[in-house]
C-alpha cells in the first residue's frame, strides 16, 4: 500500500500534469475502492464545504478551481461527478482527485456523474486518452471499475442534497436512494440512471428527457421532494450554464458547472458553491486558466452534449 509519503509524491507529480505509471494507478484505485466501499449512496457531509460541478478533463481549470476556492485539504470539497471526457487531461484530472480522496478521505467527497461509465467514456474521450497515454486500456479498466463504487449523492448537514443529474419518478425519499444497489455500471434506465441523467425543467411534472436517458422534472416535483425529505436545496451539475451557476425552480434547485470555456470553446464562466459554517451560501465564479499548449488528439470526439 502506498504510504503518505508516496501519496504526497504522487499528488505533487499530478499537480504538474504528469500522469502516474500504470502500476501506481492500479494500486491507487484499489486503495480508493476500499475507501468508497465504506461510503453510502447518500453520503453525509459536514459544513463548511465547497461544492463543485463538472470538470471534464480540464486539468488546468481544476488547478485554477483550487487556487480560487482554496487548496485541498485546507478546504473541504464535494465534487458532483463528470471528471473525465471532452477535455484533454481526463487521466491527470481523475487521478489527482482520486489521489486526494485516498490521502484526505474525510476532506473530499467525489460523487458519480453520467460520464463515470464504461459506455460513455468509450465514446467521449477517456478511453482513447488512456490508450494514447499508456498504450493499452488497463488504466481505463482500473478507473471504470472504480467508478462503480462512487457514491451517487451526498447530503450536507441533512439540508442540501447534492447529486450529478436530478430526481427520479421511482425515488420519493432519501431512504429509497439508500436502498439502491449502486455497485454496477450505470444502467440505461431506472432510478440509478435517473439520478445521474435527469434535468430540471420549466414545465411541471415529469417529462421525457431529450438526452435519451433520465427525465425532466418540474418545480412541483422538486418542491415536494424537498418538503418530504426536510431539504432546503437540491444542488446538481450536468448542464452547461453560462454564469457557472443558475438558480431555478424558485430556488429549490441550483445548477453548478465548474468547467470554464467548456470544451475550450463555449465561452462560459465556471462557479463553485461555498457552504459555510452556518450553512450560508456563496458562489465563486472563475474564468479559464491560461491556455496550455494543446496535445495532439488522435480522434475527434462527437460534438453534441451529453
Curated annotation (Swiss-Prot):
Transmembrane in keyword set: no
Species assigned in the record: Oryza sativa subsp. japonica (Rice)
GO cellular component: cytosol; nucleus
Residues engaged in binding Mn(2+) 2: 82, 114, 164, 238
Binding site for Mn(2+) 1: 54, 56, 82
CC cofactor note: Binds 2 manganese ions per subunit.
Key word Transcription regulation present: no
Entry's EC annotation: 3.1.3.16
Entries under Pfam families matching the protein: Metallophos
Keywords, ordered alphabetically: Cytoplasm, Hydrolase, Manganese, Metal-binding, Protein phosphatase
Catalytic machinery residues: 115
Membership in a protein family: Belongs to the PPP phosphatase family. PP-2A subfamily.
Cofactors: Mn(2+)
Substrates-to-products reaction catalysed: O-phospho-L-seryl-[protein] + H2O = L-seryl-[protein] + phosphate; O-phospho-L-threonyl-[protein] + H2O = L-threonyl-[protein] + phosphate
Localization of this protein: Cytoplasm
Chief localization: cytoplasm
GO molecular function per UniProt: metal ion binding; protein serine/threonine phosphatase activity
Record's protein name: Serine/threonine-protein phosphatase PP2A-1 catalytic subunit
Biological process terms in GO annotation: mitotic cell cycle
UniProt xrefs under InterPro entries: Calcineurin-like_PHP_ApaH, Metallo-depent_PP-like, PPA2-like, Ser/Thr-sp_prot-phosphatase
